[in-house]
Each structure stands twice: as structure tokens, then as C-alpha cells.
Amino acid sequence: MGVTSTAPHLLRAARGEIVDRPPVWMMRQAGRYMKAYRDLREKYPSFRDRSEIPEVAIEVSLQPWKAFQPDGVILFSDIVTPLPGLGIEMDIAEGKGPIIHAPIRTQAQIEQLRPLEPEAALPFIKTILQALRQEVGNQSTVLGFVGAPWTLAAYAVEGKGSKTYSIIKNMAFSDPTILHQLLSKLADAIAIYARYQIDSGAQVVQMFDSWAGQLSPQDYDTFALPYQQRVFQQIKQTHPDTPLILLVSGSAGVLERMGQSGADIVTVDWTVDMADARARLGKQMKVQGNLDPGVLYASKQFIRDRIIDTVRKAGNWGHILNLGHGVLPDTPEENVAFFFETAKQLNVLV
């Protein structure tokens, strides 16, 4: 038995091996649509507690594994989790997302940021990832994840999520030198954090550039792409064999650029037909996605038809089945179960 045959299904596909069906997991698969999660949330109402107390985060991460046996089990965390380690204090408000206590608006604030030391700032991440690897063994692939420089900068500068991103765009277009300094520091910290996750047990890492789709293609080329490349290059220097995934929300306008990031796998959202995505990204690029999360409100037949359509368009190599973004909080849990059941039968359905 070679190493290949004992590696978990998703990891094999992510490396480019031919597998009998596309592996499947779901973004935000640990979350509010699950009764088990809602029950736990009553006991631990703070998101930071749920994601930073190891035994709680381990339990949450494993809830979908125990319920549905996805091919990927992802660390339960948030993209802003490493920011306090740089000196950017924050909290995560229930239903509202990250709140930055002192938004980064000046050169002096950027100069005060410190390099990330994950062993000191984020020791719980190692504990969680080691436990997940031990729990799932070779039955599933453990995924880590990080935020991308532009998206973390957007939170740090805006102070919270935004519909217009007017503050960071003002900085980008009026005082780009300051923003580039911030993006550089964030890129180096994110690379350190991703390496720490891999060393702690993550077998695949996904980078979320959630807000880069808010940029025009020319501004993406200036403020997002070079820093995605910087992160991925640094990870690959030390961990060349770890597959890296890139997600950009609303990425239809920058899909080809995502393929230039250094990622091994590009997450496609539902605004791009999967067949078109394959054509635009080229035969060598692996893809992930791309069902509209809203499909999971529908009948079982509709869900099955959409899964089969997506998988046929993606072809029989280099595809990880997923939604185009996170599962929605009011999704019927039994429909998530059906999604996974159907995915596991794709070797006979397609």
C-alpha cells in the first residue's frame, strides 16, 4: 500500500489524483442550521469562546462530521481570529460579525503592529487541529483557513463589515502607500498563521478573500492579487505539497485573476456557470463549488438535479463539490444531510 491509497479522499483530489467521485464538504458546515450548534451556542453565547476554547471548538468542528461524514472537516474559527496577535483588538458580535476596537487609519498605527507569533497568540489553534486530525484519521481531510490581506485590511480599516467599503477605498485611492504597508504586514502574518495551521495538522488550507470581489479588476490587480500571491508563495516555500484554495465572493469579474494567485484550487461561486469557469480557468486549474446555498431550500429532486448538473459540468478531474459560499443559517438540516448523501453516491449517479 502506497501513501496515496491511505490519504483521505479530499486530499487526494486536491493533489490532482483521479478519484471515483468528487469529494464534498460545505463552507460553514458547522453552524446555526444545526440544532446541535444552536444548543451549544446557548451554553457559550460568545463566538470567541466557541472558537477559542479548544474543547468547545473541537466539538463544534466535529458536529457536521458526526452527522454527515463530509470528506472535509474544517477548523471552526473566524478569519479575524489572528488579528489580536498583531495588536488589532477585536470582538465578534453575534449576528453582526467582527468589530475592531480601534480601526487602523494612520501610519503610526500600522507601525505599531507586531509580527504574529502564533505559539504565543493562538495556541488553541494547534490544540484544535491536532484533535481534529486524531478524531477523523484518514476518514476525512482536515482543512484550515485564513483571511486574505485585502479582506483583513478591510475589516481593520473599516472597523466592521461594510456594504460600500468607502473608508478603505478612500485610503486605497487617496493614500495607497499606507494601505500597501498594511497589506504587506498582513500578508506576512497570514503566511505565518497558515504555516502554523499546517504544522498543527491542517492538510489543506483555504484563503478567504471575501471582499476582493468589491474591487474593480484593475484595483484587484493592485490591492488583492499581489498580496494573495505573497501569502501563497511564502506557504509554498516551506509547505510545497499542501494544497491551497482561494475564495473570492462575487468573483465572476476576476476569476481568471484568481487562477494567477498561486492557489492550487479556485472556489467558484454560483454567479458563474461551472462549465464556463472550467473554460475560463483552463484545464490545469482545480475548482471547488459551486451550488447556490439557496438550492438547499428546495425539494430533494431539485437538490439532486443541481448537484448532478454541477458535477457533470466540472468534469471528472480536479473538482471538490461544495456550495458557492457558506450554508445559510435557516437551511433545513435534513436537506444538508440529503446533499451529503447524494454527493457520496455520485460515482453511480453520474
UniProtKB/Swiss-Prot annotation:
Its EC number is 4.1.1.37. Its main location: cytoplasm. Substrate binds at residues 28-32, 47, 78, 155, 210, 325. One of its GO terms (cellular component) is cytoplasm. GO terms for biological process: protoporphyrinogen IX biosynthetic process. It comes from Nostoc sp. (strain PCC 7120 / SAG 25.82 / UTEX 2576). This is Uroporphyrinogen decarboxylase. It is found in: Cytoplasm. Keywords: Cytoplasm, Decarboxylase, Lyase, Porphyrin biosynthesis.
